């Protein structure tokens, strides 16, 4: 059957060829012929005259076969015979055939590597051996979708024609078709797309400008990027320059060439522009770098502000200088009155590089004082040059009248000071008046202006003296001296009476002598009273809030600058006062009932802090500062929280939480006889210990030698059931509170309670540290205890009579708790978070010694100071767990930076709680809303100066 089919095909081919008329003038018509592999192929051209046969197939490496025979004959057809056959006569195609040779094993004739040009059509060579197929198409080798913008035309005789090839078409493809119901896939065809230049090359220079000195090396790199390596690039030739080149491919369609131009030693004549140029078929581009070679370096200063500056006292000021320098500056300093300034809390310097060889320097002056006016100089230099600029800073201060006195010869003198120099005006009005400013001014007799140093402009406050002759006034009256400067005014009044002068005949009469002696004695008495008053301790808020000034340096924030929110105001008529809880030299704390503090119909017991009638202005300001500090801190379960205040319509009242058990120190001493110590509990039934309540504390005066620091402890062991406390949740009613108070007060005290107290105080101090607040007087006497045995940190301040408290030692005009103070606080007047940690260690010793005084038997004298300096520390209290004594010792580290933070102490004690009594702290867990976000105060304070009234170290060298 195959032979018969072939014979029919050949006859059909011969018939078609023989139909072409002679001459070849009729346009040919292409036909296709399909034969099987191994069959005979015979094609005959019946054209008169000579003919030529041409054969072309899909193999690009195969040469076109030409034959001059009338007949084309192939005995054994193979897939290599697949192609187009053309019969030509006299150069014209008479007819053509495309012959398919079916091979059951091969459906596609594939060219595995194809190169195409971007934006052109490309043929993926995969012609078919058998045209009888379905769904002749294209796919990617990895099975991923074809590019979205790809369009192609399948051609059984040629393959797949892809239109408008793009760079993204690059990849591996396969032709596929359905043949005899089976999908056939070709071998891999790799398509490479040669990019077309659509833009100029991109040139990037390593620098656009270079400033050098003679003899220095100049090097600049030109980076050219393009789609392929056909790009041309070069530096425009310079005789003294050396150019090196490097190149690399950047992916499929990226190419980079680096041309580095180098001049080993530049000269002034090398100054100019250097151009790098690049070219591709799209066009040319270039970039230029400028070189400026100098014979010598330079420094140029530009003052961006007026060099004469007026600043009000208390305000911040900035001095800014811009400058250019080459080479780079070696020295950049700010000087004040020819002395170099170092960064401190009062001033700090910021340097910044703003560009090539361009710099700025800023001197920040913080809260300028009247004494900080003067000449500020900025000096900058390098190896070749130097320059400086000077600023004259004048600090304006308000005028102040120092004296208004009657001199001899009826001369009245008024002395005022301020900057700039104040102008003094005199006013007179008859009679005794409180103001005379509406009266006409009086011309002074003489005005003198005094400067600190007359040879240079004065930057400090200027003294102005003005005098008038009181004899010009014919009647008794009031004279006013007013000093005015920059709109600020200060005035003082002087009342005088015109009296008839009585001329005495004897100067030194007995009466005059007696009067002189009495006046002298009176002056001495007044001086003694003034001295006593100055030695009287001033009330001051112990809690101090700090702020960061520069890096790790901090200063105290003036509490008067803290805001006060009037939402804390509470009506005075809703307070009903009760008994006095505590009293001091300046004020007192009174128990009170507040009606409608949180609910309109509810009464609540509170503590109200107030001043005594004898308090002065400084004490009133201090109480207001304490109120502002409490409102700034916010609420926490372990501090005495602010509930309200009365600041309007009467004396200031500060309303805080009421703590029913008083201070922790006295609570511990009350519970000594019922304390349960684990070290003695198992022997409690066999031994009776001396009651600690009857054990007298040794006085400081009675002990001169070293004493063992372990206090004696006695116990009264209650039954185990007595230690079980009910756990309450939710809010307390009045009855609940009363019952809770009775239950807590009757319960015995054990180590778990002491751990709980230690933990709560550490939590409270961690909260204060997170608020940048330093306590400065942390001790058991300053910890209050309320129902549920919850401890609360407080500052008694005005409500403690420190004059009669032996814990406070007199130093200067201050009374300080020396035995609770860290060495740096004693010797350097430095109060930090770390000094609070030291005091906390002393408090732990108080706790586990059940209220004993620290350093028992040791008076605070030069020997005590010397022992502290040499590293003496107290022994462990008898009932202290070893872990708690380890915490005490770490708190007493001589290096403040080696002491733990309060957050770390909280974590250490939590381990003790979890190991011994997991339920201890469960009764007084605090809702998250009131805990605050207490974070570890990881930033250590380098130096915080005490703002206490005593600014000198407690121990001078002679005391040791």
Curated annotation (Swiss-Prot):
Keywords: ATP-binding, Cell membrane, Disulfide bond, Glycoprotein, Immunoglobulin domain, Kinase, Magnesium, Membrane, Metal-binding, Nucleotide-binding, Phosphoprotein, Proto-oncogene, Receptor, Repeat, Signal, Transferase, Transmembrane, Transmembrane helix, Tyrosine-protein kinase, Ubl conjugation. Residues 575-913 form the Protein kinase domain. Its main location: membrane. The active site is at 777 (proton acceptor). One of its GO terms (biological process) is T cell differentiation. Ubiquitinated. KIT is rapidly ubiquitinated after autophosphorylation induced by KITLG/SCF binding, leading to internalization and degradation. InterPro entries: Ig-like_dom, Ig-like_dom_sf, Ig-like_fold, Ig_sub, Ig_sub2, Immunoglobulin_dom, Kinase-like_dom_sf, Prot_kinase_dom. It is a single-pass type I membrane protein. The chain crosses the membrane at residues 512-532. Mg(2+) binds at residues 554, 782, 795. Disulfide bonds join 45-87, 126-175, 141-172, 222-276, 414-481. SMART domains: IG, IGc2, TyrKc. It is found in: Cell membrane. ATP binds at residues 582-589, 609, 657-663, 781. The modification Phosphotyrosine is found at residues 554, 556, 689, 706, 808, 921. It catalyses: L-tyrosyl-[protein] + ATP = O-phospho-L-tyrosyl-[protein] + ADP + H(+). CDD domains: IgI_4_SCFR, PTKc_Kit. Belongs to the protein kinase superfamily. Tyr protein kinase family. CSF-1/PDGF receptor subfamily. Tyrosine-protein kinase that acts as a cell-surface receptor for the cytokine KITLG/SCF and plays an essential role in the regulation of cell survival and proliferation, hematopoiesis, stem cell maintenance, gametogenesis, mast cell development, migration and function, and in melanogenesis. In response to KITLG/SCF binding, KIT can activate several signaling pathways. Promotes phosphorylation of PIK3R1, the regulatory subunit of phosphatidylinositol 3-kinase, and subsequent activation of the kinase AKT1. This is Mast/stem cell growth factor receptor Kit. It comes from Gallus gallus. The gene is KIT.
């Amino acid at each position: 059957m195959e032979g018969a089919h072939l014979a029919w095909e050949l006859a059909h081919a011969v018939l078609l060829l023989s139909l072409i008329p002679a001459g070849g003038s009729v346009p040919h018509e292409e036909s296709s012929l399909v034969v099987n592999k191994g069959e005979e192929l015979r094609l005959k051209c019946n054209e008169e005259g000579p003919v030529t046969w041409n054969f072309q197939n899909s193999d690009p490496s195969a040469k076109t076969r030409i034959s001059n025979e009338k007949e084309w004959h192939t005995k054994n057809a193979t897939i290599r015979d697949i192609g187009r056959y053309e019969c030509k006569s006299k150069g014209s195609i008479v007819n053509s055939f495309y012959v398919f040779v079916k091979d059951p094993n091969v459906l596609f004739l594939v060219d595995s590597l194809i190169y195409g040009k971007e934006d052109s059509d490309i043929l993926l060579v995969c012609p078919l051996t058998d045209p009888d197929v379905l769904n002749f198409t294209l796919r990617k080798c990895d099975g991923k979708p074809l590019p979205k913008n790809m369009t192609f035309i399948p051609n059984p005789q040629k393959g797949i024609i892809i239109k408008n090839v793009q760079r993204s078409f690059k990849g591996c493809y396969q032709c596929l078709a359905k043949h005899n119901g089976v999908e056939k896939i070709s071998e891999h065809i790799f398509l490479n797309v040669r990019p077309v230049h659509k833009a100029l090359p991109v040139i990037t220079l390593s620098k656009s400008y270079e400033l050098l000195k003679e003899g220095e090396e100049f090097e600049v790199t030109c980076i050219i990027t393009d789609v392929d390596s056909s790009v041309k690039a070069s530096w425009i030739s310079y005789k003294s320059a050396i150019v090196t080149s490097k190149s690399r491919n950047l992916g499929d369609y990226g190419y980079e060439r680096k041309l580095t131009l180098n001049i080993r030693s530049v000269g002034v004549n090398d100054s100019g522009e250097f151009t790098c140029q690049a070219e591709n078929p799209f066009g040319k581009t270039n970039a230029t770098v400028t070189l400026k070679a100098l014979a010598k370096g330079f420094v140029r200063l530009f003052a961006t502000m007026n060099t004469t500056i007026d600043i009000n006292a208390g305000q911040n000021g900035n001095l800014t200088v811009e400058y250019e320098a080459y080479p780079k500056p070696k020295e950049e300093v700010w000087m004040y009155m020819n002395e170099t300034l170092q960064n401190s809390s009062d001033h700090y310097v910021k340097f910044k590089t703003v560009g090539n060889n361009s710099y700025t320097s800023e001197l920040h002056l913080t809260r300028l004082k009247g004494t900080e006016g003067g000449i500020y100089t900025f000096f900058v230099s390098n190896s070749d040059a130097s320059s400086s600029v000077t600023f004259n800073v004048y600090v304006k201060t308000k005028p102040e009248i120092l004296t208004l006195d009657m001199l001899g010869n009826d001369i009245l003198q008024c002395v005022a000071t301020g900057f700039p120099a104040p102008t003094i005006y005199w006013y007179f009005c008859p009679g005794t008046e409180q103001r005379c400013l509406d009266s006409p001014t009086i011309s002074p007799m003489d005005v003198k202006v005094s400067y600190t140093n007359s040879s240079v402009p004065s930057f400090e406050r200027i003294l102005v003296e003005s005098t008038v002759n009181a004899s010009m006034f014919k009647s008794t009256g009031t004279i006013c001296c007013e000093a005015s400067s920059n709109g600020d005014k200060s005035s003082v009044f002087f009342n005088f009476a015109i009296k008839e002068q009585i001329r005495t005949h004897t100067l030194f009469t007995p009466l005059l002598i007696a009067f002189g002696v009495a006046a002298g004695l009176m002056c001495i008495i007044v001086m003694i009273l003034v001295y006593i008053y100055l030695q009287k301790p001033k009330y001051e808020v112990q809690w101090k809030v700090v702020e960061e000034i520069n890096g790790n340096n901090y200063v105290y924030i003036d509490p008067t600058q803290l805001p006060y929110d009037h939402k804390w105001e509470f009506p005075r008529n809703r307070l009903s006062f009760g008994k006095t809880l505590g009293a001091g030299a300046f004020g007192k704390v009174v128990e009170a009932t507040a009606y409608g503090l949180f609910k309109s119909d509810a009464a609540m017991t509170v503590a109200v802090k107030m001043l005594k009638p004898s308090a002065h202005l400084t004490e009133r300001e201090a109480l207001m500062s304490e109120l502002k500090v409490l409102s700034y801190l916010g609420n926490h379960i372990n501090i005495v929280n602010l509930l309200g205040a009365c600041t309007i319509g009467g004396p200031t009242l500060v309303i805080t939480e009421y703590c029913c058990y008083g201070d922790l120190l006295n609570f511990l001493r009350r519970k000594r006889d019922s304390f349960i110590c684990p070290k003695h509990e198992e022997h409690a039934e066999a031994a009776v210990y001396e009651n600690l309540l009857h054990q007298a504390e040794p006085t400081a005066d009675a002990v001169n030698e070293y004493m063992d620091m372990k206090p004696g402890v006695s116990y009264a062991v209650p039954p185990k059931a007595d230690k079980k406390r009910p756990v309450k949740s939710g809010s307390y009613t009045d009855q609940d509170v009363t019952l809770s108070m009775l239950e807590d007060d009757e319960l015995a005290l054990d180590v778990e309670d002491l751990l709980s107290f230690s933990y709560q105080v550490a939590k409270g101090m961690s909260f204060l540290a997170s608020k940048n607040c330093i306590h400065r007087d942390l001790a058991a006497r300053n910890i209050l205890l309320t129902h549920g045995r919850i401890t609360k940190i407080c500052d008694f301040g005005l409500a403690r009579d420190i004059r009669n408290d032996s814990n406070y030692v007199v130093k200067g005009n201050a009374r300080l708790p020396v035995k609770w103070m860290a060495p740096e606080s004693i010797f350097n007047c430095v109060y930090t978070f770390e000094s609070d940690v030291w005091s906390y260690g002393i408090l732990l010793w108080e706790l586990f010694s059940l209220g004993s005084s620290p350093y028992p038997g040791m008076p605070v004298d030069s020997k005590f100071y010397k022992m502290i300096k040499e590293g003496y520390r107290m022994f462990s209290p008898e009932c202290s767990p070893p872990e708690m004594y380890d915490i005490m010792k770490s708190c007493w580290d001589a290096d403040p930076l080696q002491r733990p933070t309060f957050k770390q102490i909280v974590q250490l004690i939590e381990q003790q709680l979890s190991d011994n009594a997991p339920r201890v702290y469960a009764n007084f867990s605090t809702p998250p809303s009131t805990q605050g976000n207490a974070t570890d105060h990881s930033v250590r304070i380098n130096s915080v100066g005490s703002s206490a009234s005593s600014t000198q170290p407690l121990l001078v060298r002679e005391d040791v």
